[in-house]
Structure formats: structure tokens, C-alpha cells
């Protein structure tokens, strides 16, 4: 039985094979650096080439998507699907439409998805997919034609018991509808082949809210562990999409004052905080008008900071909900200097490794994305369960299940992240070890394949 000699040897081996994939290597380094002490104490997990198998996707494929724009011109985009690990259930993970999409980013997201899905305790493997197509500025007809062209190839590789995609950045309700509709036409099946669907064709209540709500439920549990709560806390949120919107909504309901939101162009600062009226306006600008946060700032006469991120604002709690690596070391240092108490990730790996290390060293409570933002995929799992039973659960039922799952994730993080001599729970270690153990045990039980 082969056994990995050391962490450095393992990371070097991965880098030699995938050295051109920095985002993926960052994710691998983050996970295995945090769980290595556990692996040294439990050598069975370093045998049977388990670690080498875990960092290699079961399959990954790239394909061309040719479609026609409104001017009759043929456009060509590149699309991918990374089916990373199915040890505990069908592949599950979103589809992202953004010009930055490449294999490295999707491998990093798919790798993270393995552990995130395992943490939910639901039977879902890890996957991720997407395209460098940018839906911004495209007509509905163009988006539909692109989605149908993409699904004409992807449908061969997905299915209710094989791989169930969902939305992600650039893939909202409109795109999911077009993708799921064409998948149904091609496969002649109405099973749950996509999650995040509209309520009129198999979707689940609370699914749009799930990631943002789940983030707040997890952060609330982190605070409760310290005898604290959101009441009266000043909160900074980055992003202004689905996750950010519903995180703001839930934080307001718990008595917090949320003072920022952002997009790729800059951020808005409101010292008085969001109100129900202001949040409704943000929903309208982003979801209906597909506008920018600058439009929101102008509507309410708020400060807008072009080209900047909201981490310079003095707050108690910071919730990065935009994109990967948006919170860098300098941002973390500024947050620490300003007295931040808690950082929880609503986006996938939005905090760099260096920033994470600085926050942990300063005893800031830190909730990693694979735990803190697992509410979205957890509710996708609940959508799959409802579809298989041909049932609709009420919003209260789904929300209660989501809340329970997030509390269970927190409990598992506490179980594996309580380290002798450390005052705070190390949620990075806890989340990574808890997710790893579930997947690793399943892989060992199923033999080498």
C-alpha cells in the first residue's frame, strides 16, 4: 500500500502535474495543510493512494459551444464540466457563466464542492462546470440560444442519478430555466436534472435565499458559541447578487446594521445601514434592471467608491459574498486593525490563504466558505428530495431544514476544529477534516476505482 511521505512531497507532486492551475493548487494547499496533523494521527487515510485519487477528478471535459447572436453572427465559447468525486452520491455543483472561467477555477470549485457537499450530510458528490460566456449585455434570445447550444452537448453527461448541475455566477433563474427546459426536451425525462429551477417547474421554496440565509445561520452559530449575536452589530457585505442580497435580508432580521454592498466596479457605503425599503430597491436594480450598485448609490444619495472593496470600513462582522480571492492580506490587516470580530465566507474561497492565516493569528472568528455557504447546495439537495417524491414543502419546512443543516455543519466543525490550547474553534480545520472523513471513509469502503 503506497503512503504519502509528507505534506511537502504531496503538494510538490500535485504542483508538478497541475502547475498551470493556480486556483486549484491554492484550494489543495488550503485543505491539506489544515488536515495534515489529522492525517498523521490517522495513517489509514494516507494509504491506497487515497489522497492522490482525491485531487484527481473522476472525469473532466471541455467542449465548444457555437451559437448565433441577434445579428446573425456565429459566436464560439468554451465550456467545461468537472465531475470530481461521486463517492457519496451523484455529482453535484453549479454552472458558472463568466469570462474568467477556465479549467483551474472549475477544478478549484469542484474540489471545494466535494467537502462542502459532504458537510451537508446529504448524498451528493462534488462537481462544477461553466463557460467563458458573459450573459451581461446579451438579449434574452441570445442567452436562450447559448444555453440550448451548451446543453446540446452537456445533456449526454448529466442526469438525476449521475450529475445534477445548478446555477452559480452568471447563471440565475432565467439561465437555469433555459438549460433545464432544453435538457428535458433532449432527454425526454422530467426528473430533477437541474436544481435552482423556478417554482412553476419543480423548484423549491427558499432556494434563492438559501446560500445567504445559511451564511447568516452559520455565522449566528459561531457568535452563539461565544455568547454573542447579530443584534447591534455593524456588518460589511461584499457583492450585490443573490448571496449578498439574502445575507443582508437575514442579517437585518436579526438586528444587524449592514453598511456596504459592492460589485466589480466599486462599493457603496451607507453609515445608516440598509432598511427594508433600500434593500427592495437593490433587489429591483440588480435583479430586474440588471444595473450596478452605483445606480443604487445615486438613488439614495450614498457614498460610492469606484474601484475599491468594502474592507476599509470599520465593522464588527465582514461577509465576503462576491468572488474568489477578493479579500487579500492587506484587506485582512485593515479589518483586524479596525477591530473586526468575525469573518464568514459567502462566496467560494473569497479570502486568500495569507489573509486567512492573518485573521486566524489575530483570533478573529473565521467561517470558511465550504461550511458557511453550504446552505445553497444543501437546499439543492432538498429540492432533489422533493422532486423525487413529487412533493412541495412549505417555505417554513425548507427553512427549518436549512437551519438544522447549518447547525449540524457547525457542530461537525466544532467536533473536529476544537484544538487543545486554542481559545477559538478553528473552523477551517474543522470543516476540512469533517468533510474529508466522510468522503475518505466512503472511498476506502468502495475499493480502488
Swiss-Prot record:
Xref: SUPFAM superfamilies: Aminoacid dehydrogenase-like, N-terminal domain, NAD(P)-binding Rossmann-fold domains
Gene3D superfamilies with a match to the protein in the record: Glutamate Dehydrogenase, chain A, domain 3 (1.10.285.10), Leucine Dehydrogenase, chain A, domain 1 (3.40.50.10860), NAD(P)-binding Rossmann-like Domain (3.40.50.720)
Record keywords: NADP, Oxidoreductase
Active site location: 128 (proton donor)
Binding site for substrate: 92, 113, 116, 167, 380
Sample GO molecular function, one term: glutamate dehydrogenase (NADP+) activity
GO cellular component: cytoplasm; cytosol
Signal peptide location: none
Top EC class of this enzyme: oxidoreductase
A GO biological-process term: glutamate biosynthetic process
E.C. code: 1.4.1.4
Coiled coil start-end: none
InterPro entries per record: Aminoacid_DH-like_N_sf, Glu/Leu/Phe/Val/Trp_DH, Glu/Leu/Phe/Val/Trp_DH_C, Glu/Leu/Phe/Val/Trp_DH_dimer, Glu/Leu/Phe/Val_DH_AS, Glu_DH, Glu_Leu_Phe_Val_DH, NAD(P)-bd_dom_sf
Residues marked Important for catalysis (site): 168
Family: Belongs to the Glu/Leu/Phe/Val dehydrogenases family.
Record protein name field: NADP-specific glutamate dehydrogenase
Organism the protein comes from: Haemophilus influenzae (strain ATCC 51907 / DSM 11121 / KW20 / Rd)
Gene: gdhA
